[in-house]
Regions:
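Short, well-structured N-terminal submotif of metal-dependent ribonuclease cores
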Residues: 1-38, 49-63, 146-155
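Short beta-strand scaffold positions
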Residues: 4, 34, 79, 99-102, ...
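Short glycine-centered helix-capping/turn motifs at secondary-structure transition points
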Residues: 53, 95, 115-118
Length: 155
């Protein structure tokens, strides 16, 4: 199972280092998760790049529609409820994390722990990889016992 935060998922829509690796993970058919917070983060990133004239209105519509199609059909969404936020207080007290990063990490930790106790069904021995393209957040995720997938470091 792969949990993608917005920094990693954005590579699916923007031609950046690691874009091909993220595309391959989608094409592999593996189950991909993210927080509903990511919906706002990716829409915001697409709109910001359009406002900054990184692409024209046709590309804006194409990217927005591609994301919305993935959101509806390819991504499993995790709610921001108290269960998913259980690790958040400890994370922000122990590490210098922005609120959004702490939410993403807490949600990924909840997914991993839920898999361990059988809330989510997976293949025997399946684990959760935390997909992130932010080195500081990746380091914290490793310290929290998550496996990390950084698309910028993959070949």
């Amino acid at each position: 199972m792969l949990y993608l935060d917005a920094s990693a998922l954005a590579k699916r829509y923007f031609n950046e280092q690691g874009s091909g690796v993220v595309a391959a993970r989608f094409e592999s058919g593996e189950r991909i998760f993210t927080s509903i917070l990511t919906f706002a983060e990716i829409h915001s990133a697409i709109a910001r790049k359009f406002r900054e004239r990184e692409f024209d209105s046709q590309e804006f519509i194409r990217l927005r529609d591609a994301f919305q199609e993935d959101w509806l059909f390819s991504i499993s969404k995790l709610d921001l409820d108290l269960k998913a936020m259980i690790a958040l207080p400890r994370l922000v007290e122990s590490y210098s994390l922005k609120a959004g990063d702490a939410i993403q990490l807490s949600t990924a930790i909840w997914l991993r722990d839920s898999l361990l106790v059988g809330v989510w069904s997976g293949k025997a021995g399946e684990t959760v990889e935390f997909g992130v393209a932010d080195n500081q957040l990746a380091k914290v995720a490793l310290e929290c016992g998550l496996q990390v997938f950084n698309p910028e470091l993959e070949h």
